[in-house]
Amino acid sequence: MADSGASVPSPDLPDLDSLHASLSLPDIPSVAATSLSTSLPAISAKVSGFPSFSSHLPPPPLLSPPTPTTMVGWIGWVFSLVFQTIPSVLYWVITFSTITLPTWLFTLFSMSLTFTMNFTTLLLIVLGLVSTVSWFIRYRFLNMYSRLPPEPQRKEPQLDLFPDVQEGDSKPGLANYLDEFLSAIKVFGYLERPVFHELTRTMQTRKLIAGETLQLEEEKGFCLVVDGLVQIFVKSMRSGKHGLNGEVIEGSSDEDDQARDGKQGYQLLTEVKNGASMSSLFSILSLFTEDIRLRASEGSSSSMSSVQPSPARTTPAPFLDSPGEMLNGSPMVLPRDSEVDSSAINGEAEPLPPVPPLHLGESRASSYHPNGQSTASERVRGNRRKSVHPDIVARAMVDTTIAIIPASAFRRLTRLYPRATAHIVQVILTRLQRVTFATAHSYLGLTNEVLGIEKQMTKFTTYDLPNDIRGAALDRLKDKFLKEKDRLGSEEVTRGIALHNPYAGRRRRSMSFVRKEAALKAKMPLPKRPNSLINPERPFHGYDTAGVSPGDLLSTIQLSRFGPRHDQFATTPRLHSPLTEKERSPLRRSSLQRKDSVDEDALFRESILDCIMKGIGLTPSSHNALRKGSHSGELSPKLVSYDSRRQKAVFSNNAFGFIDAYEGSGDGDTESMMSMSVTSAGGTSPIVYLREDLLNDIEIVYFPKGAVLVEQGERHPGLYYVIDGFLDVGVQVNEKGDDLVGASRPGHAQPDEELFPTLKRTQTATSRGATAAAPINESKRKKPSRKSLYMIKPGGMQGYVGAMASYRSYTDVVAKTDVYVGFLPRASLERLAERYPIALLTLAKRLTGLLPRLLLHIDFALEWVQVNAGQVIYHQGDESDAIYITLNGRLRSVHEGKGGKMTVVGEHGQGESVGELEVMTESTRPATLHAIRDTELAKFPRSLFNSLAQEHTGITIQVSKLIAQRMRDLVENPMTEQGEPGNTGSVKTATSTLNLRTVGILPITTGVPVVEFGNRLLSALQQIGVTDGVTSLNQAAILNHLGRHAFSRMGKLKLSQYLADLEEKYGMVLYIADTNVNSPWTQTCISQADCILLVGLAESSPNVGEYERFLLGMKTTARKELVLLHADRYCPPGLTRKWLKNRVWINGGHHHIQMAFRLTAEPSHPQTKRLGTVLKQRVQILQAEIQKYTSRRIRQTPIYSAQTPFKGDFHRLARRLCGRAVGLVLGGGGARGIAHVGVIKALEEAGIPVDIVGGTSIGAFIGGLYARDADVVPMYGRAKKFAGRMGSIWRFALDLTYPSVSYTTGHEFNRGIFKTFGDSQIEDFWLEFYCNTTNISRSRAEYHSSGYVWRYVRASMSLAGLLPPICDEGSMLLDGGYIDNLTVAHMKTLGADVIFAIDVGSIDDNTPQGYGDSLSGMWSVINRWNPFSSIPNPPTLSEIQARLAYVSSIDNLERAKNIPGCLYMRPPIDRYGTLEFGNFDEIYQVGYAYGKEYLQKLKSQGSLPLPEENEEKKKLQRTLAPRRASI
């Protein structure tokens, strides 16, 4: 039994084990599993009915969870989990969701709950709920404008004044004698090494003790101070008015000299310090031209008559290969009295023998005289008779060392280096005009003295035509013009009719031919052929040459190639030289034409050319002297070249290389060709080429009576020779002459490039002569009275001085009668002067001979000063001793306030002066003056004023006018010390954009298309008409002009002078930095710029670029402006701020320009490999992109499209740079300001561009809308939407608050403005914009041009009491109209030339009041409602407060109306109230109708500055550009 009992549970044990395993889940603790296993035997014992046998059986060994080593245990555990645990969990979930949860819900919903409350409680709960929702919407959703990231106004950059290391007036880096000397001879311009050594070889020094005097009248040389201080005195009295050479000047009308009582005192002219010259510009000219003859007629005729037999007067003698030989080989014998006169350039009084002596000294020159005599004694006697320093005495203040270059050195330099001499003379003549003539004419009113020089010059330049062509031939010429005059209209005739020139068509071909032949000849051997060039058989001349024979000209060919008049055809002489035969081939074809049609015209041209060349000093004797100079040029070490292959290299930088600053030759070898052909010893003179050129260029022109040939202030177009008729030379009486110093003349537009020099006159004369284009403007322009000075008769020349020396005309030239003139363009004269130095030397000699004594003394006192970039000229608080006139460069006046704060007072460009007021009042300097870039100045000492005032009392009147004008400017624009940034913005940019002469275009980083940008800007500047034209320069242009050594150390002097001449010639020069960062051209662009445009791509990274880092490293103080190029006409909000944030050096503003460009950056100089493949791929890509848009049926037009060309972005930038910006000022007036929208639409329809927008109150709102997109359509829509919001009475009522500060919270007003502008910033606007506010915390007006638009527009519209002030950086801002409701004055400071000012403010009630000394409020109310009362109603309390607030605004409004250039407009909107925004359409129509009517009235009066008129004139000039109306 026991065994059976023991064996019964054994088969159940595995089941128990499986049960144990199934109950022992992995997550059950082991303790629970153990207790369960211990209770299992007891349970099994109860079930089986047996007593417990646990004590008899051992515990089961397999009751623990299966281990990983037991595979069967794992399988059992998994089966238990799947088939038992998971179903149990699912069962529980289903039971809870279907039974338990519904039961709970049923129980909950079956319960009853009752709440009891009154209506007040319910209403409070609802109000609380609504308030919560309203608060959330109001303060969390609708006022996002208050949670914008803070963007304060951009502070104006602090001015960088780099420390000045120089003391006072000391020169930079002067440490020794040589530096002092080099500083003094800078007046000569660029000197190459041989010229410099030759000039200084015989220099002497002299020591003066303190108090010692030196009679400069006895000194014959160039004097300069090396060390010490010298005072220059002038003798105060002298009988008569003498010229430089001691001769009494004719026509001088200075009665003051005879009115003296005979005092022989001395007046202090100036003080000369270290490194300055004691000689004047005129005295230097006289040293170079001591032996030049003034008039060629007597000398040439006598010499020619002595040379030629009397029957041969009809056959002029050509110029020989050897100056000492005649046609038959016999030596020339010149009379004694003509020996000195025939020597034109060298200092010797006799012609050199055929083989020049191999020496350089002048002392042995007399031994080579053919007669064995020397004229040195005569020269000494002549020098004693005349002095280059008349009446001048120098006194040393301290022990002084002076250096003297004797006159012999200048004579030797003239003989050895004629072209270098001509270059020096050209430089001095240019500085003479800029310094002495301009100062005397403009500042001192010495118009008669300056203009008298040109009047007296006519006695040297008048040559009559031969008699045989003044009779029937001239009548036939007139008949041709009369026929053409009848055919053409009056307007065409006024511009001039030119006779057809048959040679003009071959002009360019012959020029290239000349260059080739010159190169050929330079490589040819130089044979000795004394007279083989000239053919003994000369054609017969059928006309008399009693006056001037054409054969007297500088030519190796027969000039009169026409036979007798009865001959049917003309023939050309046969020249033995193959080279000259080749030269003559172009003209041979033209000569075989009908004699009666072509030859007569050509004869006129030949004769006119004869007279012109005699007038300018090109005569046989001068040619002989030139040939001597050429022979002696053999001695020049620079000219010796033993390798013909290296000749080109030798002469590419020769000492005679005259820098032609005005003629941009496309041939880089032109200069060297000229040098070789002119200065080669022996050989054929290239005069034949020049002769051919001049015949090609000369024109015969007819002008009717009243036509203007030259306008006052313009550069001379060329030389006019009067054939028949009279020219009247005069000046405008009301002309102040300020423009003659070089300042800009806004009303005078000239073309930019002289592609057709012969048409220069027509391009300027049409503005006066043509009356059909703009009759109103022309009649108004002719209103100023004109004063006639003198007349030019037949045989006279006009424009000799101006055209030869490239001066501007001080007079205008009008045809007194119908006049026939020969015209030689200025470019031809410049070519002539370049090849033949005698022309400039003759001009210089004549100028020095005609100089009045007064101008000579002024020239002595004026000092030419050159300062470096950043150099301080004088400091604030220094003693004022001189006035400074800017000749070239740019200056800036800076006022240093409290705490070292720098404020820009003004900038002074070319032609402007600074310092008059303090010099005249003997006060200290009010500001520091420093040079922005390398600058040339004319220093006008105060001692000169004192001397002139005592001796010439008439000058004091002119000086008094000058001081009065400066005082008036100071009163109107006081230089007050502004300590706050809000108002200094207008002062810092006071005159910074006026008179900009150079603009540098610099990319921010590589890949910016600056070349394309520069070309488009150049085109825009040309279209708007820059005074004197505009040109652009890049590295290729510079290398083409000056060669590959332009940027070397030696070439920098050439480059600087070339750039200075360009800036003097053109009104504006663009420097395009199209090279690498560290290239010399990039450095030149930065150092030469008055204003630097930093160009960047708006969508690219705003990080600082490599070009900017290079710019900052150069430490330039020029004005810097940022230009952002956009592919589309849109600027995302905040983009501009990112660019300006890291660029504190941008001190001139920024511009948004739309320009299509490639988004992929390209290097400045891409490699040329696979260029064709790359271009082909790019073209294909561009075609595909274009076809994507052009193939669509519907083309989406942009929001804005410029309807007129001058409304483009480049034209806007061009007007800003030229100072011709158009400003729009919108005044405040509440709802009446809706009329602004209508007026702006009228301006748009009239085609008037707007460049700057400023506004006050509602004007700030409308102006901001217009400046944002520069279009009327979005402005109209947004303005109407805003007016609808403001017209809602409910919005106003919901915004009411307790009136502790204001009646409304301002939220609805803020929301209306913010919904219009969004988060845009003022910097992102397409047009420049500003608005003004009243800072009641600091009691001043502020102008805002940066920051969030909505804030400052809201501040400008904040009426006191209605809206709370806007808080800005701790200050409270209110409506700007309280101080200035029409900000015309501030707009003027931003550079606007024409300002449209629209005033919509309320009109003050000026009704006289008479209610007595006391006033009852009750009576006032009754009187207001009494219709029968005749007493006007007294103002209410609110009206009195309003009038009090606008007191200063009314005063500023009256001033604004009188500001020059302001066009005041006031639409008839007085019947509308300040808050009547509901009448939007009606007020808009009133403004639109008024604007159209006003602009039409201005247009009919000719007062509208419409760019269309200028464009019309430019189109007219462009149609004239190819040629005048020709026969």
From Swiss-Prot:
Keywords: Endoplasmic reticulum, Hydrolase, Lipid degradation, Lipid metabolism, Membrane, Repeat, Transmembrane, Transmembrane helix
A Pfam family matched in the record: cNMP_binding
Subcellular localization(s) per the UniProt record: Endoplasmic reticulum membrane
Any one GO MF annotation of this record: lysophospholipase activity
Principal EC category: hydrolase
UniProt-listed InterPro entries: Acyl_Trfase/lysoPLipase, cNMP-bd_dom, cNMP-bd_dom_sf, LysoPLipase_patatin_CS, NTE, NTE1_P-loop_dom, PNPLA_dom, RmlC-like_jellyroll
Residue numbers spanned by region Disordered: 299-387, 567-596, 765-785, 1504-1527
SUPFAM superfamilies noted in UniProt: cAMP-binding domain-like, FabD/lysophospholipase-like
Domain PNPLA: from-to ranges: 1224-1388
Main location: endoplasmic reticulum
Membrane topology, from the record: Multi-pass membrane protein
Annotated binding of a nucleoside 3',5'-cyclic phosphate 2, by residue: 846-966
Chain location of the short sequence motif GXSXG per the record: 1255-1259
Species in which this protein is naturally found: Emericella nidulans (strain FGSC A4 / ATCC 38163 / CBS 112.46 / NRRL 194 / M139) (Aspergillus nidulans)
Lumenal topological intervals: 95-116
Transmembrane segments: 74-94, 117-137
Motif GXGXXG, chain ranges: 1228-1233
Binding site for a nucleoside 3',5'-cyclic phosphate 1: 682-809
Catalytic site positions: S1257, D1375
Role this protein plays: Intracellular phospholipase B that catalyzes the double deacylation of phosphatidylcholine (PC) to glycerophosphocholine (GroPCho). Plays an important role in membrane lipid homeostasis. Responsible for the rapid PC turnover in response to inositol, elevated temperatures, or when choline is present in the growth medium.
Biased composition (Low complexity): 299-310
Enzyme Commission identifier(s): 3.1.1.5
Taxonomic lineage: Eukaryota, Fungi, Dikarya, Ascomycota, Pezizomycotina
Ranges annotated as biased composition (Polar residues): 364-377
BP terms from Gene Ontology: lipid catabolic process; phosphatidylcholine metabolic process
Protein's UniProt name: Lysophospholipase nte1
